[in-house]
Amino acid sequence: LLNGFCTSEQPLTRSENGVIFGSLAAAAKAYPELVERYYNQLAESQGDAVSALNTVFAQDGAFVYVPQGVWAERPFVISFSYYSEGESLAGFARNLFVFESGSRAQVVIENRSASDETYFDCQVREVFAAEDARADIVELFRLNGRSSIVSGSFTEQQASSRVHTLSVGLEGRLIRGDQHVALKGRGAENHTDGLMLSGAGQHIDFTTDIWHISRDCTSYEVFK
């Protein structure tokens, strides 16, 4: 995605096993009932000013849907590139990941600057993990020294689900992430980890909010 918009000639794909991957805007047109069932359900109820701002301006982003019992063979790779010539820009990407019961998937997200201009991105991600779903999400930040990103991640997990999120911040003037997790089903397990390698003049800040709503849930958290 370039500046928050999908530029591919084929913005959305659906495999034989029902997996849907690609542009959120394209998914909303092709599968409106599916997207409407989940879109903004978490950000609206749990969100803050960041999610509210994104909801107002968001037009596109990434969409991942893995049906019940499907094990995705390859990771879903999502690249957000930020590019401008001679002017400062802002983007508002919105991402929606849905993992149905018994599914397995891996998602790799890259946020990178493709020019030396100033860029500001306000990004929101909603993740739904149904019963016994397994999802690993790795997010990498590589921005230039003039660009910033603020993001909100909202995850809802049902019984016996497992979600592992790893955020790696390498470069960027400001990288701020708020991660909200709701463990709503018995036996749900969450891992929220981060590795921040900041230099002079850089600020990286992550906050986490993990709610053990159901009993016998487990959460682990490591940030360095």
Where are these predicted regions, by residue range?
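Conserved beta-strand/loop scaffold segments within soluble protein domains that form the structured core
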Residues: N3, T7-K224
